[in-house]
Amino acid sequence: MLTLFSVPRPFHGHYGIIQRNAIKSWTLLRPQPEIILLGTDDGTAEVAKEFGVRHVPELEYTEQGRPLADSMYKETEKVSQQPYLCIVSADIVLMGNFMSAVEQVAQRNRASLMVGQRWNLDVTEPIDFESDWEPELRQDMLARGEWGPRTGEDYILS
């Protein structure tokens, strides 16, 4: 049904922790989406292998070294087996209600666009995904988190 794709930052320090948390959360979604990590930044290939997701290194970049959005979509479309594509920031933890929302949108109309806004929560340690992590993280988010900017598009599903 769905391919999640992202261009992670290098997996160093705090960004390494939050991106690993996010990508692990994606692997736990049901139904399980196809997951593609794009680019060649440090750790991308290794993390893709660690989590059993696809790695596509080929991308076109701007002169400033930023990946081109059309290149991200083009490379994902070449290998994706799913009807819906969702670009998602590599630091966004997705919970089970995400797939419920995707399914609702898919049932209404094939030609859809879904965007989302993040909650900012400072998570400095790996999440214990063996525990009852979703309710615990949601409770922490409601207690300490803040809405991200309204202009932030942290995932775009089409």
Describe each region flagged by the PLM:
Residues 88:
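Catalytic metal- and UDP-sugar-binding loop of GT-A-like glycosyltransferases, i.e.
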Residues 37-85, 95-96:
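Active-site-proximal specificity loops/subdomain of glycosyltransferases
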Residues 13-15, 42-47, 122-125:
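Short, charged/polar "capping" segments at the starts of alpha-helices
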Residues 1-24:
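N-proximal low-complexity "stem/linker" segments adjacent to membrane-targeting elements
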Residues 2, 24-36, 53:
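Short loop->beta transition adjacent to catalytic acidic/histidine clusters or analogous donor-positioning motifs
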Residues 77, 93-158:
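Conserved catalytic core of nucleotide-sugar-dependent glycosyltransferases
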Residues 33-40, 114-115:
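Short, hydrophobic beta-strand segments that form beta-sheet elements in well-ordered domains
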Residues 16-23, 71, 97-101:
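Well-ordered, non-membrane alpha-helical segments in soluble/globular domains
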